[in-house]
């Protein structure tokens, strides 16, 4: 009879332990019910990017002096700079400037080291396309400024920074 009583006691202890574990899991689930959802409904909602976000590169053709510093500091030698030497004024004249965003790693070295600040990072990050050759931007495509997410009335913007509590 003694083994039967110890068996019932072990069964009772295991039942209580299982109920405690189930209760702990349920309490964790209940603690998450008051939180805001983390998922963003992407095409209709967008996160406002931070100030230092490295998106598509914007290029100003008039400021460029064709020094090719951007090519030298790029880890993958990506920007293609075509220029012609004007012998009468002894200066380089920029003919073509292009960047293939299918290869670009968005490190920002070209923007940081440009002596004339003709390159800047924008908040544009949508590069989806069916043909990867459309990701090769010339100076005309690089010169276009993207539409700001904040100005787009069809999209609800969500702040990226965590909300701080005063108190």
Curated annotation (Swiss-Prot):
It holds the Pfam family Fer4_9. This is NAD(P)H-quinone oxidoreductase subunit I, chloroplastic. Its cofactor is [4Fe-4S] cluster. The keyword Magnesium does not apply. GO terms for cellular component: chloroplast thylakoid membrane. It is a peripheral membrane protein. One of its GO terms (molecular function) is NADH dehydrogenase (ubiquinone) activity. The keyword Cytoplasm does not apply. NDH is composed of at least 16 different subunits, 5 of which are encoded in the nucleus. One of its GO terms (biological process) is photosynthesis, light reaction. The gene is ndhI. [4Fe-4S] cluster 1 binds at residues 64, 67, 70, 114. NDH shuttles electrons from NAD(P)H:plastoquinone, via FMN and iron-sulfur (Fe-S) centers, to quinones in the photosynthetic chain and possibly in a chloroplast respiratory chain. The immediate electron acceptor for the enzyme in this species is believed to be plastoquinone. Couples the redox reaction to proton translocation, and thus conserves the redox energy in a proton gradient. It comes from Lobularia maritima (Sweet alyssum). [4Fe-4S] cluster 2 binds at residues 74, 104, 107, 110. Its EC number is 7.1.1.-. It is found in: Plastid, Chloroplast thylakoid membrane. Keywords: 4Fe-4S, Chloroplast, Iron, Iron-sulfur, Membrane, Metal-binding, NAD, NADP, Plastid, Plastoquinone, Quinone, Repeat, Thylakoid, Translocase. It comes from the Eukaryota. Belongs to the complex I 23 kDa subunit family. The lineage of its organism: Eukaryota, Viridiplantae, Streptophyta, Embryophyta, Tracheophyta. It catalyses: a plastoquinone + NADH + (n+1) H(+)(in) = a plastoquinol + NAD(+) + n H(+)(out); a plastoquinone + NADPH + (n+1) H(+)(in) = a plastoquinol + NADP(+) + n H(+)(out). Residues 55-84, 95-124 form the 4Fe-4S ferredoxin-type domain. Binds 2 [4Fe-4S] clusters per subunit. InterPro entries: 4Fe4S_Fe-S-bd, 4Fe4S_Fe_S_CS, NADH_quinone_OxRdtase_chainI, NDHI. NCBIfam families: ndhI, NuoI, PRK05888.1-3. HAMAP family: NDH1_NuoI (MF_01351).
